[in-house]
């Protein structure tokens, strides 16, 4: 106790000294649809990860960057941990696991109620060996039962691996700001890795592709969206205007799916393209001419060559 008091006195006496720059790398892991991307977007203050109600929306590791004074927080939003059903799923699961090796601390998100999945329990065991971790119980806005929330906190505490347990709502922001002082404790001194005004390291083309895929996920029937991949084939800024011409390929697994994506009279494809174009214009700060094309690549989720070509690199 005396030592803690002495440390506090020293800190107080030197409070006017400027803090040195530091950075902390943070992985966000958890089951599909637990709110990792929503939390990333809320903390960053920008849309860097697409969000839908469908599980497994995030496929690649997404980087969000926040700089608060001398501290830069680098968030790695990972695919949801689940039992793989194809080679794409396997790569997604490997990406989530590999992220634990690249960070200073891990945020593991949990639902406020319900049983823990086998994949969640496996991730908890992986965290025992990986390093510091903080538990984040999300979606508390959906829970009015204080006793149930306390019971959930106790369940998570019993894992015995988390330095802290935080309750948040990524939807309305409740408790989210409390994460920054906790994460700051794991920061390492040194120059920032990214510009202080950066919010992601994702290329513009990749962001555009994700926005198109988000609209397909939102508008398409359940059986189709997870068989879709999106790539930007061309991205050209016109030198004489503020217009950007973008050509996008939407890849699907079945000819029947191609017809559904295009829709009667092309209406579904127009709906997807129109909604994506508006988001692209907001992202790029310019007018966008977005052309979307649909191509069939049968069983691409189980084809390593196609996965490589579509940008799903092995971690």
Predicted regions and their residues:
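P-loop NTP-binding site
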Residues: 204-315
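Canonical P-loop GTPase G-domain recognition
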Residues: 132, 141-200
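Conserved C-terminal guanine-recognition region of P-loop GTPase G domains, centered on the G4
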Residues: 94-165, 236-240
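The conserved Walker
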Residues: 32, 55, 172
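Switch II (G3) loop of P-loop NTPases
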Residues: 46-50, 72-88, 112
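Single conserved hydrophobic/aromatic residue that forms the stacking wall/gate
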Residues: 1-12, 62
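Walker A/P-loop
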Residues: 37-38
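Switch I (effector-binding) loop of TRAFAC-class P-loop GTPase G-domains
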Residues: 24, 45-71, 117
């Amino acid at each position: 106790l005396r030592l803690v008091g002495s440390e506090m006195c020293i800190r107080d006496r030197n409070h006017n000294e400027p803090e040195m720059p530091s950075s902390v790398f943070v992985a966000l892991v958890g089951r599909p649809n637990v709110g990792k991307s929503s939390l990333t977007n809320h903390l960053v203050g920008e849309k860097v990860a697409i969000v839908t109600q469908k599980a497994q929306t995030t496929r690649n590791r997404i980087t969000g960057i926040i700089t608060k004074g001398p501290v830069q927080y680098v968030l790695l939003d990972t695919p949801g941990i689940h039992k793989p059903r194809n080679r794409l799923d396997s790569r997604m699961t490997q990406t989530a696991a590999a992220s634990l090796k690249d960070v200073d601390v891990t945020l593991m998100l949990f639902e406020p109620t319900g049983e823990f999945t086998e994949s969640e329990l496996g991730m908890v065991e992986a965290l025992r060996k990986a390093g510091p971790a903080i538990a984040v119980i999300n979606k508390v806005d959906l829970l009015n039962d204080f006793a149930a929330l306390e019971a959930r906190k106790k369940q998570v505490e019993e894992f015995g691996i988390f330095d802290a347990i935080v309750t948040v709502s990524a939807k309305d922001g409740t408790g989210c700001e409390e994460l920054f002082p906790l994460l700051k404790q794991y920061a390492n001194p040194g120059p920032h890795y990214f510009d202080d005004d950066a919010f992601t390291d994702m290329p513009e083309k990749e962001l555009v592709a994700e926005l198109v895929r988000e609209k397909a996920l939102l508008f398409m029937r359940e059986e189709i969206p997870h068989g879709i991949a999106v790539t930007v084939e061309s991205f050209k800024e016109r030198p004489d205007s503020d217009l950007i011409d973008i050509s996008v390929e939407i890849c699907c697994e079945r000819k029947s799916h191609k017809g559904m994506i295009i829709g009667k009279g092309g209406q579904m494809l127009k709906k997807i393209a129109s909604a994506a174009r508006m988001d692209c214009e907001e992202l790029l700060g310019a007018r966008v001419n977005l052309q979307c094309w649909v191509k069939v690549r049968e069983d691409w989720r189980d084809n390593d060559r196609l996965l490589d070509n579509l940008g799903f690199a092995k971690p």
